[in-house]
Amino acid sequence: MAANEYDYIIVGAGSAGNVLASRLTEDADVTVLLLEAGGPDYRFDFRTQMPAALAFPLQGRRYNWAYETDPEPHMNNRRMECGRGKGLGGSSLINGMCYIRGNALDYDGWAAHAGLENWTYLDCLPYFRKAETRDAGANAYHGGDGPVHVTTSKPGNNPLFAAMVEAGVQAGFPRTDDLNGYQQEGFGPMDRTVTANGRRASTARGYLDRAKTRPNLTIVTHAVTDRVLFSGKRAVGVAYLHHGNAVNAQARREVLVCSGAIASPQLLQRSGVGRSTWLRELDVPLVHDLPGVGENLQDHLEMYIQYECKEPISLYPALQWWNQPAIGLEWMLKGTGIGASNQFEAGGFIRTRDDDLWPNIQYHFLPVAINYNGSNAIKMHGFQAHVGSMRSPSRGRVKLTSRDPNAHPSILFNYMADPLDWREFRDGIRITREIMRQPALDRYRGRELNPGAELTTDEQLDTFVRMRAETAFHPSCSCKMGYDDMAVVDNEGRVHGMEALRVVDASIMPRITTGNLNAPTIMLAEKIADRIHGREPLARVDTPYFVANGVASRKQESATV
């Protein structure tokens, strides 16, 4: 084989790219080049390795692309944060470590589209199990020997977690013991991608640690991919910058784009694959007119409903610098304590109205009052619910702004563009207030800090959402899978109209899933890896799962305030 020639070139060492790199190199006769624009996942850096430090990577640019949106027209024209991971592990290196697979009906909804019939939940479940090692043990829903370590909530954690779950049940919503099991709907403990010794379980740790010593895998960090190289309509390699030096690499079989929902469409467009009118604006030579590239962009928007805590049991003391050395030392030496948890140990999914087919609102409970990125901490004991809608009908786009591979694209999520968005956020605030006023929280609940109890009308709540709602960091769907005119890839990630070119990451989701996106992204990469290998897919299972089928979203005899 010629120098700098490989069977497969993978662009992006994130949640999907690391899965493919690991699985493809299980075959010793297959050579893989894995390119990552960021650096290594330094294991000595507490900012990415300590679960409780999850806000730190979002505050800088070493591990975060720190994109910003265009002014969002329905959000007071705010330019909103769009953090994405940079480094081995991608966004699994900087995310909140919540392991949520989505609802079974998400995948059944994908499979309802012509050509995607093999993406039902029961087709996907074997791949969720394949990827996972859950500390509570394997069962029909969970795996026991996969690369991703998943930890469950343990006795002795902050009492606010149990109180918030109990309050949700007292408000009439279901209790579920496993948000990734038979029934997602309801309130319960949240699984997290954290190792047994309290470290972040990124895909770099889970997948690359298994694969990086293989002689058939070459990993190059600080490699910014400029464009995919083509011979006609066939992808034959990539051009990239390594520490600023131009390098070409050849792919004998395929180029696999795994750069995420922002950078994957950007790379395709820069390479000449996308909407011809957009490319013409920047004099990008057209390889293939594919108008769906960068369209259909989706995300989860969320808000923080915050309360004062009457008892001194919140994480507020952990925010004080004088307490942090002891927390860090316990974590470093023992892998225990506050530092060993992402502190998202409870949450839930609800239907706000009986005619919703599956949950449309997600909750993360946090025993402190602070923004996700560590900003705007309330200077007192407090707690909060992160509340967000799950399947907004609003759609955005990613658009190339320059042929410079270091330039950021134009990003517009078009948040809150549909009347349904406003209804769901108003419902979310009002239902959350009901939950927070339940007896289970009486001993802890102080005054409402945000939005503030004085805000009650639709107009007041809408103003709060415009001013304060933030991204949940779940961009997706911008290179969607399917066979309609706006689809970008087929049911195995192959780019329509092209040869030897795939996209494999969250951008190929036809519709965003109900919950966090790391677990679904790993699953779809595992599933497509088998197809790249030419293997038969894992057999569809017949494991039961909950479908509401008209069941009321909450018990009417519950306490309401």
From Swiss-Prot:
Which co-factor is required?
Answer: FAD
Q: In which pathway does it act?
A: Amine and polyamine biosynthesis; betaine biosynthesis via choline pathway; betaine aldehyde from choline (cytochrome c reductase route): step 1/1
Q: Which residues form the active site?
A: 474 (proton acceptor)
* UniProt: FAD binding residues: 7-36
What's the superkingdom here? Bacteria
Annotated catalysed reactions: choline + A = betaine aldehyde + AH2; betaine aldehyde + NAD(+) + H2O = glycine betaine + NADH + 2 H(+)
Q: Name one Pfam family in it.
A: GMC_oxred_N
Question: EC number(s) for this protein?
Answer: 1.1.99.1, 1.2.1.8
List the molecular function annotations (GO) for this entry.
betaine-aldehyde dehydrogenase (NAD+) activity; choline dehydrogenase activity; flavin adenine dinucleotide binding
Write down the InterPro entries for this protein, in alphabetical order: BetA, FAD/NAD-bd_sf, GMC_OxRdtase, GMC_OxRdtase_N, GMC_OxRtase_C
Question: Which protein is depicted?
Answer: Oxygen-dependent choline dehydrogenase
Q: Which gene encodes it?
A: betA
